[in-house]
Structures are given as C-alpha cells and as structure tokens.
Amino acid sequence: MVKKEESRLPQAGDFQLKEGSVVDATRKYSYFDLFRYSTRCERFLLVVSLLVATAASAFIPYFMIIYGEFTSLLVDRTVGVGTSSPAFALPMFGGGQQLTNASKEENNQAIIDDATAFGIGSLVGSVAMFLLITLAIDLANRIALNQIDRIRKLFLEAMLRQDIAWYDTSSGSNFASKMTEDLDKLKEGIGEKIVIVVFLIMTFVIGIVSAFVYGWKLTLVVLSCVPFIIAATSVVARLQGSLAEKELKSYSDAANVVEEVFSGIRTVFAFSGQEKEKERFGKLLIPAENTGRKKGLYSGMGNALSWLIIYLCMALAIWYGVTLILDERDLPDRVYTPAVLVIVLFAVIMGAQNLGFASPHVEAIAVATAAGQTLFNIIDRPSQVDPMDEKGNRPENTAGHIRFEGIRFRYPARPDVEILKGLTVDVLPGQTVAFVGASGCGKSTLIQLMQRFYDPEAGSVKLDGRDLRTLNVGWLRSQIGVVGQEPVLFATTIGENIRYGRPSATQADIEKAARAANCHDFITRLPKGYDTQVGEKGAQISGGQKQRIAIARALVRQPQVLLLDEATSALDPTSEKRVQSALELASQGPTTLVVAHRLSTITNADKIVFLKDGVVAEQGTHEELMERRGLYCELVSITQRKEATEADEGAVAGRPLQKSQNLSDEETDDDEEDEEEDEEPELQTSGSSRDSGFRASTRRKRRSQRRKKKKDKEVVSKVSFTQLMKLNSPEWRFIVVGGIASVMHGATFPLWGLFFGDFFGILSDGDDDVVRAEVLKISMIFVGIGLMAGLGNMLQTYMFTTAGVKMTTRLRKRAFGTIIGQDIAYFDDERNSVGALCSRLASDCSNVQGATGARVGTMLQAVATLVVGMVVGFVFSWQQTLLTLVTLPLVCLSVYLEGRFIMKSAQKAKASIEEASQVAVEAITNIRTVNGLCLERQVLDQYVQQIDRVDIACRRKVRFRGLVFALGQAAPFLAYGISMYYGGILVAEERMNYEDIIKVAEALIFGSWMLGQALAYAPNVNDAILSAGRLMDLFKRTSTQPNPPQSPYNTVEKSEGDIVYENVGFEYPTRKGTPILQGLNLTIKKSTTVALVGPSGSGKSTCVQLLLRYYDPVSGSVNLSGVPSTEFPLDTLRSKLGLVSQEPVLFDRTIAENIAYGNNFRDDVSMQEIIEAAKKSNIHNFISALPQGYDTRLGKTSQLSGGQKQRIAIARALVRNPKILILDEATSALDLESEKVVQQALDEARSGRTCLTIAHRLTTVRNADLICVLKRGVVVEHGTHDELMALNKIYANLYLMQQVSG
C-alpha cells in the first residue's frame, strides 16, 4: 500500500472540517467567526490584549477624576469658599488637601500642591496607559498576522481542493483579488482595530461606572443621550456591512475581467479590444462607486446625529448640573461640586465621543466580516471530488482494466445539454483504444471522466472493477499520464516541468523521457539547457516544443494508464513521426486511451470506438470496422481519397514515396538539429512570463534567482503627501466642500473649550440667578455648536468619501488602461505576470483610497482643531500654550519614524505577496493540469515558502505600530498634566485667571487628542504613499512601440497592399543574444496565399507576431505597400488583420459577444453578421442546438471541445472581414469532417484576401500561391507546391514523409 503523505501545513491542519460535517456554502459568518483559525494560546492572548486594552481605557476616567478634582479645587481656592471640596485621587500624589476658612496664601500654596499632584498623576497615568496600549496592540497585530498567514494557506488549499465543476460554475473566483484585497481587509478587522474598538467602548463603560459612583442623578440625565448614540452607531454599522458586501462583489466582478484580459492579452491586442475591455471594466466599477457613496452618506448621517446628541447632552448636563451644585452650595457635606460635574460630564461625554470615534473602526470590522464571508464560503465548501483527500482505496497493483458503464453525463455549466447518453465501453489491460467521431461528440469528456474531473450523473467508470469514486483521487491520478490538446507548462525550467510528471525522477530519467519525446536535442542546444525558463504558460517556447515537453512529462511518470488527447496536433511532420513512434512504444505497457482526429495515427489501435450523439455507434479494430462498412469506414474512405489525390499529385510533381521514406530519417535529422538551435515562442494568446516555479531544484538555481531579484529590485518613486492628494484633484469640488466642513467640525472642539472655561468662571459668581441665566446661555451655545458639528461631520464624511471612491474608480480605470496600453514585451517581463498585475491593480488603488476619502477629512479636522486651539491658547496665555505644545513634537516624530520604517517593510511585504500570488494564480488558472499531475501539495509548499517571507516583512511593518498609537493616546493627557501644572502656578502667582487656564488647556488638549485619533490612520497613509508611488510610475510608463497618428501616408488602404519582410533580424526581449530571424527576406503579394512551413522553432510564428506588431524588428523592416509597419497606427494596422491561432482564447462573454469581438471597431455588429460568420466556420448548428443559443455564456473553463473553440475563433476572425487573414494551425484541433468543411470555408474566406498561413500539416497548404520553408530564421526554399516537390529538397522530403506516415 502507498503510504499516507503527511500534511505540509501542520499549523493549518488543526482547522480542517471534521469528518462528515456538512457546511452550507451560503452560510452567514459573524465577526467572531473571523477568529476560527486562531489557536487556544492565541485566543487566550487575544483576551489578554483586550483585557489590557480595557485596563488602559480605565485611565481616561482616571484622568477625568483627577482633572475634575483639580478644577473644582481651583474654583474653591480662588473664590475662597468656607470648606474646599473633598478629593480622593489627588491626595495619592500629595495634593487635594481639604481646607476650611483658609487664607489667601494658604489657598495659593494649596493650588501649587494640587497642580504638582495633578502633574505627577498625569505623568504616571500617561506612562501606564502608553505601556498598556502598546502591549495590547502589539499582541493583537501579531495574533492577526498568524491568523492571516493560516487563512492565506487554507484559502489556497481550499481552492486546490475544489472540484472542476465548481470552477466551471463559479463566477467570482478571481484569485489574485481575494488573496490581496480581501485578506488585507480581513487583517484590518481582526488586528489592532478590535483592540481600538474595545479600548474606546470600555472607556465609555468605565466612565459610566465612575460617573454613577460620583453622582448618579446627573449621570442618569447625561446618559439619556447614549441609547440614541448606540442606536445610530449600530444602524450605521449594519448598513455598512451590507453595503460592504455589495462593494466587494462589484470589485470582485471587475477583478475577474482584469485577470481574464491579462491572461488573454495577445488576443485583446490582435483584435484591438483595449477600448472595449476598458469600457467593460469601467461599467463593473460603477456599482462599487455608487455603493461607496451610499456608505459615506449613511456614515455621515450617523456620525452627525451622534455629535448633535452629544452636544445636546452636554448642554443638558451643565444646566442640570449647575442646578444640583447651587442647591447644595452651602452644605458642608455636599455631593455635587464642580468636580462631580466635570467627572460625570467628561466621563460620559468623552465615552460617548469615543463611541463616535469607534465608527470608522467598526466599519473596518464590518468590511472584514464581509471579506471573511467570501473567503470562508470557499474554505468551508466541501469538494465533491477532493484531490487532496486521504480517503479512498489505494490498490497495491493496477492492471489497467477500464470500463465505462452506462455513462450519462452533462457539464455542470451546461445542464440542459446531455453529452453522453448511456455510453458503455470496455478497455482491457494493456489495450490501446482510440475514440473517434465528430467534434463535440464526447471524446474528450471520457478523458476527463477517467481523471475524475467530473463524476457521471448515471452509470460508472471502473478501473480494475473498482468504481473510480471508491478510489483515492490523488492515487488514481498518480496512475495516469496525460497529454492534452493544449498542454500547459508552468513558469519554471524545462527540467522542472518534466519532473512534475514524477517528483522523484532523476536527471537521467528526465533526459530519457525527453529523448523519447524527441525534445532532448533542442533542449541541450539552448544556452541553459534543461535550466531554461519556459515563461508563463510556456510562452517562451514554440507550440511544438511545448507539446513535446508535455509528452516527456507524461512519459517520465511511467503511468499505468495513458491518456492522449490529440497529443501530436502541434508537431511538425518530423517531430510527429518520431513522437508518434515514442507514444506507440510507451503505450505498449499501460492501458492507453487515444482521442484523435487524424485516423492515420490510430490504425494500429487494439480497438477503435466511433462515437456519435453521446453513444457508441461502432467499435472494433481498424480491419473489423472497415469490413463492416459503416460510419468509420466512410470516414476512412474520405480520408484515403483525399490523401491519395494529394499523394498522386505529389509524386507527379517530385519524387516517389519510397525514396522519401528511405531518406527521411537521415535528412530530417540534420534539418531538425539545425533548425532547433534557436527557438521561438509560439503565437500565444495568453499572458506574460515570469521567473518563478513551484519549487527550486538546486541551490545554484536559488542563488541565481536571488541575484536576479536583487538586480531587478523594484525602485518606487518617492511621493509626498501633497502629491498623493493631487491624485484626488479632479474631485476638487467635493474636497473643497468637505474641507470647509472639516474645518467647521474641527473648530467646534476648541470653541467648546472656550465656553467651557467661561462656564467655570460663572461658577465663582455668588448670585445664583446670574449663574443660572449665564449657564442657560452657554447651554444654548452648546446646542449651536452641536448643530455646527453635526452638519460639518455629515458633509465632511459624505464629501470626502465620495471624492475617495470616485478617485479609486478613476485610478483603477486609468491603471487598467495604462497596463493594457503597454506593448507585449511589458507582459513578457517576469515582474509583470498575470498574478502580479492583478494583485498590484487591486491593492494599490485600494491603498490610495485608504488614506484619502473620509480619512483625509478626519486628519483635516484634527489639524483644524489644533490650529484653532493654538489661536485660542495664544490669545489667553502664550506661555501656557507653548508649554502645552511640548508634547506635539513627540507625537509627530513617532509618526515620521513609523512612516520611514513602514515604507521599507511594506515594500518588501508587497513584493513577497506578489510573488506568492504569482505561484497561486498560475496554479488556479491551470487547475486541470495541476490536478492531473497531482501537484497540489507542491503548489502549496511553494506558496507557503513565499507566504513565510510575507509574514516576516509584515511583522517588521507592525513592530512599532503599538508604540505610535499608544503615544498618540497618552500624549494628550501628559499635555494636560504639563499645561495644568504650569497654569496652576500662574493662578497661584495671580498672573492668570483660573477659567483662562481651563480655556487654554481644553482648546489645546482637544487638538492634541484629535491628532491622536488621526494617528489610527497613519499606516493607511504610509501604505497609500507607497502605492501612489507605484501608480505614478505606472502612469508615466508608455509603450516602447511607436504608434504614429493617422495620415495620408499610412492610410487603411496602404495596409492592404503587398507585405514585404526586408532583411528582418529579431530576438525576443526576454532572450537577448538568441537571434530568431537572421536577415529574413519575404514578399507576400496582395490577394495571394503564402504558407510558412518548417520544423518548430524556425521562425514561422515570429513572422506573424511581427506582422501583428506584437514586437518590432531589431533590424530591417516589415513593409506594407512600401510603408514600414512601424509607421502605421497600431489599430489601423490590426484592423485589417484577422487572426486564428493554434490555441484560441475565448472570453467570459456570450458566444455572440465572443464572435462580435472580432470587430471591435464597431458597436453595431449585427446578429445576422455573427450568424453568417458562424455558418462559414461550421459552428452555427452546434450553437443553435444549445438551450440559450448564441446567448450561451462561456465561462473561464467552458466545456467546449477544442474543435468547437477553434471554430468560434474562426468565426471571430471572419466577422471583421479582414483584408489579411492569418492562420496559425487554424484547423489543427478539428476532426476530419469539421476540418474539411472549415477548410472549404477558409478557402472561400481567402478569396480576394491576402493570407498568411502557418501549418505543420502540409496537405492544408499545398494549394497556397507560395510556400516558404524557413530554417534558422531565413527562407531557404520558396515556390509553389509543385515547384518545391520538383526541387526535391527539404519541403519535398517533409511532405512525402508526412504522406507515408499518414
């Protein structure tokens, strides 16, 4: 038995679902569910951090108590009452002595003692509070990082565990966005935010308790406002959570488009779809912008109501409080004194204000909960076919007896279309069974069922008599080798790609498999041999080479079951002959299932099964089926008649078949060795390339990668906060109104302090009626200030939020537009992989909004409070003002130091996250290949390595976060101590009135306090500055390709003339020093068909890419009507080119939209034009038979067969009515019947058009007006088919050998 593989994520394994548990995929998660992946120790430490935060919050009521006692004693000792108010806290520090009928001198000395005690008490409290908050935030952040680290790993693991059916039907599976934006939001909500919220809420709770202890009557009156504040806050939080989910959904849909476009960037360029994609992306951002504005409106209204209630409550408190004080004024054992009024008022009001300050943090928690909803729904979803599950049987021996029994099946994304209808096929051990039939009949479906990508809805698939559903999924797939029609290679070395077939394979095993797959020679001729990087999706090598590496990967696996789905479709004749022999040799041991359109490759099969309409129409050996004279015989007869005609014509034109057969092995060996010395990438329609694989193979490779990373280290422009704000300049109207509102709101705090000082001054008046009248006036003023604060806060929040979301939408659109406006070389850069670009686009724009929008209003409000407070302070006492401001440099210095530190560590964290995203996105994008090769654990291991680096960088980032926030909270109270200590001395020396020192202190301390609240957003600002630098660098970048404006010199008509390659030299930007074309000269006359042939790597696809201007020549030129292609506007040039590539990319649009995509220069492509193009490509009948017809949506992993996708791609090219048609193996994926019809359609389409064709199957180009044979990047032979056959050299040899093998 195979040993159970140990989990490589022990820290995540403790959090898997229990066996047999059932999870609702639509379950709603509470905030507490966000901590489900914390350990017991972490939960204990989190509780400790919250208790520590609670202890820290107790110091705010403590400050209110000593402040109330001190201010009350100031009044008593200045007025000279009979007996001063009792004190409980100040005596601990040497003050608060209760005097009776004291002299003026005694009172003044007592004031100095009280001031000293207050200063000492403030210092002790500030230090204690600073230490406690630092500890609480540091603990919470570390715990949050641990959990996010686990959730990242678990999320990828959950994605890798999902069945293919989920990928087919999932509309929001954009991986890069979830791994960056959603997890960042989750981290925000489970880290310091929860500590800050608890700190602010417990300040309120403990303040209420203190207030009740000192004066329950007044406390009850003041508390009357609290239910309204709590109600407003809770309603806003609930609305915020609901809207946050909608906002995330909108951004998720937009991120899907980004990932899809970047993955198919060459297709977008070929059909000039940039504007259409920008429009699609922009439309998907509109709901997010509208939702964001609503969030701002609701938040503003809630905050406004809270502030209005707070000021109304203060007005009521001082009015009622004075009544209580005056009633007991002359009593020796009075309860209500100015001290009690201050303690109750400040304890309750500051607590209520803290509830208001908690609002944005509560919003972050609501957003985190919404983000957790999307993440946990995936993590908790039980996969129907889990490739990483240890359950299931693992037989010791595998004979390879396969039986498909009564199979009924329909794809999950197309439940109305039944593909297999009761199919039964028996495959004996060691047999080679071939499946043939029209495109879409279910051949490839059987291959997928064999791998358990899907389970049949009826019937069963059995291996050695065991239902596949009873076998361990990983074990089953480890027994199978697969070579698909469109093989996927990963962005690592050639050697590593082959080793993925069997991780334990030695270098000798790899080379043996490569020789069998006929790719060893071209690999060893590369400068780095098996260490050559293939690029993302194998973009750096040709299609034929990619397929041979995939074959080597399957062969090194030494499988018991071999699945070949058009395994040689991308090979040239020479390679095909050799690889076919290798495959036949490899298939002698294992049971082999073959899907083939070329019947010549399956005549030796032990059994041939002809499928039609989802059932077996015929089965038997080649000879048996020919004798039966049924469907198979008819298909073979058509093929033989076609090939006989072509062979006869070839023999007449050139040389006998036998001679070709005898010479082929010798001559083509030399040709291939010569021509594969320098390799070219194929004409890809997929993404870019990068330099990272799933795992490092040697220490030397890791050292090389480190050197390369150091060399290519990202240098980000430095951006000031002013430059950051300039990004928001188009929204200046909102910012101006919001700025005025922020200043208005900020000014209310020092104004309140000013009148609060007057209130204390009034208390010294001996006439009770005067006191009552003046206090009533001040109460009314407080109501006015409340209205001013409420209106200012609402406008501030709404205007800045609107400015922020509008800016974010604009930045996302501009960044997306800038990226797709780059040249292909930009996407070839390893730093610009699909995963990295998606991650960058999502996080950078989000980060910039994180420091703009509503947070700018909060910071501007804090500055306004401080400035107005300073003005008030200098008016009343410049000495006390200067001394009070001594703490501000400490606060500002802490922000500066944190900023410098965060900028460095955030850059490292960003780079590490991008690398991790690259690994993950590549795996998820190619999930079928990952599943087929059982690479899930390897992907996870590599991702874990990258995430560990992210974790280190993030821990450095938060190291000083607690210190800075704690300093922002503690510094204002230290400032209180300093200010009131010095103010008390000034009062004792009769240099200042006691009410004035209260005015100065309140005005300034509120400014300092507001600055402390603004410090909660310091990390957002630092992240935003870093992201803004990256965005500005991006915006400055322009394509290196010239794109001249339209002129009479480069008209559309000019692009329709002769095409001339004039002494063209070219090497790919990512492979400098490896020339592909070396002085190529080629003329393509207008309205003629020219075919480029030659073995893989000879430069054929490069010629096409230069014509499409994916790249420009290094030397020489490509001319159209005598005008160099670089003189044409890109859109003008590409508008007349119709491309059908070897591996077509279709987008997540309807079939009609995909076909109409061929003509992006018009918005009014009619349905009639679409249908006509579909008919020409022989796909109309298939589309019409679908339940939704042309409105059928093609998802990311649509269940169309290769032939169906190819025909839609052909329709897409034809709908634009191109003057130049480019066919790169356009019929390679079609069955014989479809190929014949489509070839006729292409022949008709070529009429009156210039046509450039690339083909390995030379029979498809024999009617071309000119055939050019390329070798080492130059044309070595050219002429018509007959002329080249008569020449009796390379082309004749290739052609006749293909006829013999066919």
UniProtKB/Swiss-Prot annotation:
UniProt entry keywords in alphabetical sequence: ATP-binding, Glycoprotein, Membrane, Nucleotide-binding, Repeat, Translocase, Transmembrane, Transmembrane helix, Transport
Record InterPro entries: AAA+_ATPase, ABC1_TM_dom, ABC1_TM_sf, ABC_transporter-like_ATP-bd, ABC_transporter-like_CS, P-loop_NTPase, Type_1_exporter
Main location: membrane
Record's bilayer topology term: Multi-pass membrane protein
Catalytic activity: ATP + H2O + xenobioticSide 1 = ADP + phosphate + xenobioticSide 2
Gene name in the database record: Mdr49
Organism listed in the record: Drosophila melanogaster
Entry's transmembrane regions: 47-67, 117-145, 193-213, 221-240, 301-322, 340-360, 735-756, 780-801, 856-876, 878-897, 960-980, 997-1017
EC number assigned by the record: 7.6.2.2
A GO CC annotation given for this chain: ATP-binding cassette (ABC) transporter complex
Glycosylation positions in this chain: 101
Protein name stated in the entry: Multidrug resistance protein homolog 49
Top-level taxon of the source organism: Eukaryota
